[in-house]
């Protein structure tokens, strides 16, 4: 920062974006307050923070800045979703929506959910690894077909893991009923081979996506 600017950053939420034995992606929602002269601006962005385990501790080895998908203009449904969620949207997720690059099916699903519950989005595309972590397979996030949600009903998904009927589980069930083809969550809602799955990676968020 220049001499006449001061910045303070705060971590809103760190969420796993990929997990291997000795490395991980931690998608970190960061809110930054910058005062320049008499003006204060605030931005919230999601960064792909890469960490590695050296046998003793986990260390940050890279921070990948978010990018925005190319697009044109948001659909009416996306505009309405922004109005519903904007206080809970990181700027990177907002940019993906305003670019019109988020899949219509995903926008419609989130719009229905926002009508009945409150939730906070971590990431659509910007800030998410381009590939499924540790593989060469493109992520549905990269094409605007996936979303990660870290908080539902005012509580983190992580804190709702052990509850048989929680707001987070209700959102996952809504996505399953709506035809989402990937539902990563702390619970497997439809058994082996179905759209829903649970693993160590998806204990701290909901991953909702549609295949192309």
Short names for language-model regions:
Residues 1, 17, 124-133, 191-192:
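Acidic helix-start/capping segments at beta-turn-to-alpha-helix junctions
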Residues 1-5, 96-101:
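Core segments of small alpha/beta cavity-forming domains
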Residues 102-136, 184:
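Extended, low-complexity, intrinsically disordered C-terminal regulatory tails
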Residues 37-41, 137-138:
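Short consensus segments that form the blades of beta-propeller domains
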Residues 2-39:
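Surface-exposed, charged secondary-structure patches
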Residues 77-97:
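Acidic/histidine-rich, surface-exposed loop or edge segments in extracytoplasmic proteins
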Residues 16-24, 52-56, 152-154:
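A short, structured loop/turn motif at beta-sheet edges
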């Amino acid at each position: 920062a220049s001499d006449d600017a001061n910045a303070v950053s705060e971590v809103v939420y760190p969420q796993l974006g990929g997990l291997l034995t000795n490395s991980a992606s931690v998608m970190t929602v960061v809110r930054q307050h910058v005062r320049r002269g008499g003006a204060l601006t605030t931005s919230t962005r999601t960064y792909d923070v890469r960490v590695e385990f050296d046998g003793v501790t986990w260390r940050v080895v890279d921070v990948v800045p978010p990018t925005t998908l190319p697009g044109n203009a948001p659909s009416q449904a996306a505009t309405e979703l922004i109005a519903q969620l904007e206080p809970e949207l990181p700027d990177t997720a907002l940019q993906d929506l305003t670019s019109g690059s988020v899949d219509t099916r995903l926008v419609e699903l989130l719009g229905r959910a926002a009508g009945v519950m409150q939730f906070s989005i971590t990431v659509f595309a910007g800030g998410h690894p381009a590939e499924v972590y540790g593989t060469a397979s493109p992520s549905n996030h990269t094409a605007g077909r996936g979303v990660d949600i870290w908080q539902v009903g005012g509580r983190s998904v992580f804190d709702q893991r052990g509850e048989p009927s929680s707001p987070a589980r209700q959102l996952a069930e809504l996505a399953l009923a709506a035809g989402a083809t990937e539902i990563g969550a702390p619970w497997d809602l439809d058994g082996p081979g179905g759209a829903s799955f649970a693993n160590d990676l998806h204990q701290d968020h909901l991953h909702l996506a549609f295949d192309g």
